[in-house]
Amino acid sequence: MSRVGKSPITVPKGAEISINGANVTVKGPLGTLTHNLHPSVGLKQEDGVLTVVLNNDSPEAGAQSGTARALVNNMVVGVTTGFERKLSLVGVGYRAAAQGETLKLQLGFSHDIIYNLPKGVKAETPTQTEIIIKGSNKQQVGQVAAEVRAYRSPEPYKGKGVRYVDEVVHLKETKKK
């Protein structure tokens, strides 16, 4: 069993967990998430604490225990506090505007980019050059942030483009004669 898989998950108040065989459902103030666990691992719930249990002694079960624990923990955190990714737009004329279920981006192309947000993900634009993507599903929030960044990823000479707030862009030196 992996070290991550051995550590228990504490379930905060406001989160309900129902285990039906390999299907795990977590309900909280920010929504409901479900996940099917690998057949070699299971979950045991007692006194508001979840632990991962191995269904067999195969090496695969030990490897899957850490993955299962991390996924269920992300579900618990997602429905109680949620996840967010912050993006910043660097460049002249680069702007973003959140309009309901869509995100309008001006990234130096001849046309505006309209990005339709998936269900369960929200976007905010506190300023024109800042985007905050929020949601309860960690994978989905990261996927949306990566797709928005892919429209104009930071270029290596001036650093212009869409970048994560905590991202460090290493700039190349220009060619010398």
From Swiss-Prot:
Q: Which InterPro entries match?
A: Ribosomal_uL6-like, Ribosomal_uL6-like_a/b-dom_sf, Ribosomal_uL6_a/b-dom, Ribosomal_uL6_bac-type, Ribosomal_uL6_CS
- Which domain of life does the protein's organism represent? Bacteria
Pfam families in the cross-refs: Ribosomal_L6 (PF00347)
Q: Which UniProt keywords apply?
A: Ribonucleoprotein, Ribosomal protein, RNA-binding, rRNA-binding
Q: Which GO terms describe its molecular function?
A: rRNA binding; structural constituent of ribosome
**Example GO BP:** cytoplasmic translation
An example GO CC term for this entry is: cytosolic large ribosomal subunit
PROSITE patterns, per this entry? RIBOSOMAL_L6_1 (PS00525)
Q: Which HAMAP family match?
A: Ribosomal_uL6_B
What quaternary arrangement does the UniProt entry report? Part of the 50S ribosomal subunit.
The protein's job, in short, is: This protein binds to the 23S rRNA, and is important in its secondary structure. It is located near the subunit interface in the base of the L7/L12 stalk, and near the tRNA binding site of the peptidyltransferase center.
Family in the record: Belongs to the universal ribosomal protein uL6 family.
What protein does this entry describe? Large ribosomal subunit protein uL6
